[in-house]
Amino acid sequence: MIRTTILALPLALLAGAAAAHTKTDATTPADGATVAEVEMLRIAFDAPMRVIAAALTRDGAEVAIERETGMEPVEAFHAVPAETLAPGTYRLDWRGMAADGHPMQGGFGFTVAE
């Protein structure tokens, strides 16, 4: 019984480490926020992430953004709207590759007030 426990403990610890994936720490604007204007779109991660694709949409239609972060792994992704955002509800969706090689995706929404 003790031998089984001793052998199982390292496996349990490895499984926990393998299950830990990069997570979003914060976004700008904050998820669900209502703001007057948006000068910068930012996603902060708890570990380096290579953001492969990012798309901003309003009512399902894509809105142009200019990436300020390259394709290298970063702890914070930055982009700016190509034009001033009109009032409405927006969503920024992204796809990326975590440092451990796992594909990741996420997104957040915000509203620009009139």
Predicted feature locations:
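Exposed loop/turn and edge beta-strand positions of beta-sandwich/beta-sheet ligand-binding modules
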Residues: K23, E39, E75
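Solvent-exposed, flexible loop/coil residues
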Residues: T28, E39, F108
